Structure formats: C-alpha cells, structure tokens
Amino acid sequence: MNVLKRGSDQDNWWQAYPGLYARELAAYEGHGASHRPLIQQDGTLILEVLWPMDSAGSIRLNVGYSPLHPFCRPSISAPELQLERHQNPFTRDLCLLTQDSAQWYPHQMVADFIAERLSQVLQVMTLRRNEQWSEAASLEEQAPDPVTPYHMHVAEEYSAVFFDGQQTVPNAPLGTAVFLLQDRLERGRSPPFQAILSKVEPLSGTWMAKPFDLPKRAGPWKNVIGRWIRLEPPFPEAPEEILAAAEKAIERQSALFPAHLKKLGSIADDDLSITAVVFQEELSYGPDNKGNGWFFLVSRRVPGSRRRQVSLVRGYRLSSDMLSRLPVASALKSKKVVLVGCGAIGSFAAVELARSGVGQLTIIDFDLVEPGNTVRWALGRSVWGLPKTTALHDFLYHNYPWTNVGRGHAKVGSAISNVDDVRKLEGNPMRWLRALIEDADIVVDTSASTECQGALAYMCRSIGKRYVLGHATEGAAGGVVARFKPGAPGCYVCLQQHWSGKTLPLPTIDSSGTIVPTGCNAPTFTGGAFDLQEVSMEVVRSTIGLLAPDVYDSGDWQLSILDLTENGRRILPRWKAETIAPHSSCSCGASQG
C-alpha cells in the first residue's frame, strides 16, 4: 500500500519528532499489536492497529493522531465493535477520556493509553450488563450518555428549538405540537429560525398542561402547528431516514382513525413542517434516570418544485437549573437593583448583574452612546446615537429574559432654570427617585459624579438602603469601589473627610490622561474597557455580596482601592481593602463619640 506523505518537516509531527514517532510505533509492538498507516498527510496520521485481546482474538482500531501531537489527545475508533456506551454509534469512536483535557498527558504513548483505557471500558460494559452499578460507577465518569448529542453533527447550524426541560407529554403515542417561530437572518443553505415548543397535545380529548414560553419575547413570532410522535432508539443517522421512520409510525398509529391521519398528513404538507420525536434517553447518571429526549425534524418545501428538504434542528432544554453554574443566581432572582450611571463602568456592571440573574434592574442615565464610547462601552456600532439606557435595556431584554429591566433617561439631581421646562415635568423628580430607592434592595452608583454620589448616599442612608459606588480615576490608572450598609459606622461623608485629611489612601491617578475629543464640549479621560472593567467587576461582586451574603462571601471591607500603575508603569491589578471609620467631623462620627 502506498501511503501519501505530504508537508514540510515542521508541519508533520512525525517528521519534526522522528524519535517520538519511533517510540510510538515501538509501543504498539510492545503490546503485541500490529500496525500500518492508513493515511499520513497534512499533519494527520491514522494507523490501523490490530489490538490483541486475551480471549477474543484481536480488535481492529483506527488510531488518529492530532496534528498537534503529543500535546492533544488522539481519536480512537473501533469499526467492528458495538458498545451501548462509551462509543459513538456512527463514527464508532471510543470515549476513552472524559471531557476534561487534563486527562491526556503528552509524555504517554498512545499504545500505553489504549492498553489502560480500553480494558477499563470493556470491564465497565460487563459490569453494567450484570447490573453491578456501583462497581461500574467506580470505573467510569458518572455522567449521562444521552442519544441526542451523537446526532447533532448533522443538525442545522443556525436554527434552534427551545423546549421546557420539564415538558409534560400526553400518555399517548402521537399528537399535535404548537410552536412559536421567528425567522433569523439568512445564513447557510436553509432559511434559519428559532422556535419555542409551546405545547404538545393528544389528537383527541382535552390537554390541560400550561403552554411554555420565555418570560419575554421581542419581534414578530408566528404560531406553527406541528406533530409529535414517540419512537424508540436506536435511530438512523440521516434526518430523512428518521423522518421516514416517524411517518411510518404515524401511519400505523393512525390506521384506526383515518381523520387523524388526514390531519397529521396536512401538517406534513405545509411549506415548513416540524415533527418532534420523543424518546427515552439518559438525563442523569444511573440505571433508572431516563427521561424524554427530543429530536426536531424540519421538512421544507423546495421553492419551484415538489421536492422537500429534510433536516435536523438542534433542541435546547430550558430548565430551572439553567443558572446552576452560578449558585448565587437563585438568591438574586428576587432582588431589585437600581443602577445610576451607564457609562464605562456602569454599562458593563449592568450586563453582568443581568447575566447573574438579578430579578429587577432599573438603569438610569441621561447620556447618548457616542461613537467614541466604543473603546470602553459594553455595546458597539449598532447602538451609536441611542440613549444609553435604551441601548442597554434592549440588549438585556433580548438576551437575559429572566431579568426585568426598567430604565429612566434622566440626569439625577439636574436643576432647571426655565419655568416652561418645569411645567413639562411629569411629576416630582425627587418623589420618583425616592420611590425607586424605597422599592430597591440596593442602589449602585457608577455615575462618577460627586454631586450624585453625595445625594444618593444621603438618601440611601436616610431610607435604610444599601449603597455601592464605583468609579475609575483619570487615565484609567486606578479606581474605587465603596459600599455602605444602613446603620453601619462610616458613611460617604466620612470617606470624603478621610480622603481630604489623607487618613485613607487615594487611588492612583494619571492627570495626563485627560482629553477633549473633537466636537465635544467636556473633557474625558483616556482608558479602555480592558482596564476599566476591573472596577466594573468589583462593583458587581460587591453588589452581589451585599445582596446574598449567605451564598456569596461579601468580605469584611468597606472600601476597595485599585491601582493599575505605579511610578508611571503598568502593574498587575492591585486591590487594597480598607475600613471606613467614622470621622469626627461627620455627624455619624460625632454620634459615635
């Protein structure tokens, strides 16, 4: 057999490291395995290996080496082996490693790796067949092995169906399904869409299950009636073949009820028809942890012909554990935050608070998004010229539907000298602001305005609300995050007095980092988001710590001071933690005496 070899010495690892290649081949021989190359080109080496087994002769393996060998793991398939787990049913790739890449060690020979892991996988399969579950669990990763992921390589790239992880399905073999569908921007060969599986119903009788939906949806959506059918795995690989199996099952189930067959057949003739296949698959590890798995098959009429194009659309399970990667999220879903100032610090803080699962977020700012803001604002070109609160509100509304976002396009504390403008006001601004603060669990001030800070700090202390302020310094050389609890010693005025008297450290500033952009009538400081987000993230951490101290450690400091430079040079971000003691010149400090 002539094996094609192509590429420079540095492009092919076996040529770049000939000694390693020789050791790899010798390792197979050391285990009594024969080998021959199937392909050896463009950085890829695939060996056909006859691996000896103690009692069953040998197993043929195809061993694919990564172009970045030895740093990255190999791919090993067993074309003639059929395992119920730990093997892709289509490619026959063996799952000998978990998803944790740290299990592959560059110094090991692939043959030694096979000798260790293959026997372990086969032992696990024997234990599972004998229902020795605890023994099997001690040898394999305790993770489910669902059917669905093995089919996703043939799924459409840009379409998606979202469904309730606790979706209730009628005790029936088939029925109709209600989808909410929205077209997406044209990409790929098939017009993409996103859909929500709202409800599945039996063909007859009344089904009382509550329809499923997202908390909020934006833009035009339409109702699409589809079908659902129960099938049993295994399934063929091609979507057309799965749909053909579903059609046969529908025909069999509807044989006694011709009207039902006609109804489901008319759905199949729609320009876009969705058939949901329900089946049992592992949802969690263990012998009795199966639940409903879903395939979504889409049949589209090809324009100008009678042909139809069938594809598989990826389904995404939405459930109460969606935020399980962030344990504090469950404690935040009932919390209300008012954030004042949506600039370089506040815009990122707003996004992170919504991302973290805060239940209610009200954002307040008076400014518009300038093109020059792009280098240090959370959103980009598509929102230039919009009010900052509008841009953030719309982004958060679309992307974090479990957070209710309110907005106020206003400058807190601004005075008016025109009588006509006062008459245009919709109520008393003070009453509006006080109502927001009274209803909130915490106020976050990223306005970078000492006037605004003084007013909000006073109102929060008098009303009894927690208050967090955060801002960067000139030239993005440092920053400050301070947090105040109602009734706690040390207040905003105390902080200012300590800074004035130099009894608390000040953050670093770079007075040369101030510019007046062309066309702008106010100075601003230089600095990019990659530095300023240091402050934003501590604002968020401090806010979450005050909102949910039992879940997320809030720390025992009141003041965090950030330095990003020292002696004119960049340093690694350095935070200093301080306590704000009551100051003798402040009324709260005097009361302590």
Swiss-Prot record:
Assigned keywords, A-Z: Plasmid
Top-rank taxon, per record: Bacteria
GO molecular function term, any single one: ubiquitin-like modifier activating enzyme activity
Keyword flag Cytoplasm: no
Biological-process GO terms, alphabetical: cyclic threonylcarbamoyladenosine biosynthetic process
Protein name: Uncharacterized protein y4oA
Organism: Sinorhizobium fredii (strain NBRC 101917 / NGR234)
